[in-house]
Amino acid sequence: MWKGSMMSRSVKSIIALVVCAVLAACAFTAFGFSKSFGANTDRSAGGKVIFFNFKPEGKDIWIDVANEYKRINPGADIDVKTPQSNSYEDELRDAVKNNPDAMPTLFQINGPVGYAKWKDYTADLTNSPLYNQLSNKGLALTDNGKPVAVPYVTENYGLIYNKALLARYADLHNSKLKPEEDGVSFEDQITTFGKLKEVADDLQKRKDELGIDGAFTSAGFDSSSDWRFKTHLANMPLYYQFTKNKVNGQPSSITYDYVDNFRKIFDLYISDSTTPVSQLSTKTGEDAVYEFALGKAVFYQNGTWAWGDLANSGIKSEDVGMLPIYIGAKGEEKQGMATGSENYWCINKRASKKNQEATNEFLQCLLTSPYGKDALANRLGFATPFKKFPKADNPLVQAAVDYTAKEGKVPVTWVFVTMPSNGWKDDVDSDLLTYAQATKDGMTSMGANQAWDTLKKAFVDGWEKEYKIAHSKS
């Protein structure tokens, strides 16, 4: 903050002139006034940006960004709409029925599967700042060589862990980890499912000694939490299966390869947990956040986007680290974090031309101005794929980047973007909860084994069924 008492009137005047010049430069250069988009300097006569934001946790920040953009661009018109969680596509489908001056101009798809649904609305981004500001243009989703969607954030997920709790555990007699002071970090000690299970089982056995409720946070099946398992955890067996079978793109069918490895890691989550399986159906994402942030659990499956919630709940940045999710696959000691994006921006080609131009002007400012870069990288905590962006002020992003940078580590691809439908995910989710509840009589009881067999059929046979349904539509 500038302190007025320490500056002379002349210095203040100079600063005011500099600020005005910078704002003017941003408004007339960096904000997209170029022949490429046919913009003009009379912004009040221009179009409107209607941004359909996908991430509810960033709603207030996007409103701030819109207000700041309007403040330094008198006459600019921008509206941020944020559908409720799990209703994005339904609300978007309704919104694009509006006339061209009122329909969304900037919206999100989740990758190739989403593009198949929305390709009739996606504009060619060849001349858009969204595409031209990418640090690696190969990240864009293309159709016949034309960029149609651009990832605005690359994210990582894995097992977030509490460093302070693991350090306390490592100091216990006969613990399964050595203190990091001995020269080997926790993430370099836990590099396989076998080691993770050994540590988690011992943490659970000694939970009273450590003052925790369990090794893992609750695997809640409320809609605020279940996506962590039906989508992100399910990615792990699919990734190894696709890698083994050299699958590219979306397959019409899958196999049973590695599905039982899915069971191994999920069993660990629910047996070494803060919560009995009988309560999982109502446990929420917020419950898991608080269990972890308050030191009641050591491990929490989530991603880099979770830092805001964790920080707001009181955990310190120096107390968090991240491990890959191990499932007992051969060669997993070389595995990095699950890294990718299901967050692609598209410009709506059915919106009016003036609204598309206004949207490109807004994006130019967002991706090149200091304020826009700070909003994306720091306030929203995104690891962005655009040119000349600062590192995100997010310890989970840094932990993931540092781990994946280790020699020989291979990031796990987000193949879940090829899942055939939400119906497939929901069927897997329902059967996964049924299985969890069946384990009350033992992880390998007859009821649990039967429930798992049902899930495997939903996983494999359901994929082929949902793929046929999705691709039979004209």
What are these regions (language model features)?
Residues 146-152, 157, 194-250, 297:
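Extracytoplasmic/periplasmic solute-binding protein
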Residues 2-114, 127-132, 173, 178, ...:
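Conserved N-terminal structural module of periplasmic/extracytoplasmic solute-binding proteins
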Residues 108-169, 173, 321-325:
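Hinge/lid segment of periplasmic solute-binding proteins
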Residues 82-92, 191-195, 279-294:
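Short helix-initiation/N-cap motifs at beta->coil->alpha
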Residues 200, 244-283:
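Glycine-centered hinge/linker elements that transmit conformational signals in sensory
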Residues 373, 384-396, 405-474:
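Conserved C-terminal helix/tail region of periplasmic/extracytoplasmic solute-binding proteins
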Residues 96-109, 210-213, 294-302:
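Alpha-to-beta junction loops
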Residues 77-79, 313-381:
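Extracytoplasmic/periplasmic substrate-recognition and gating elements
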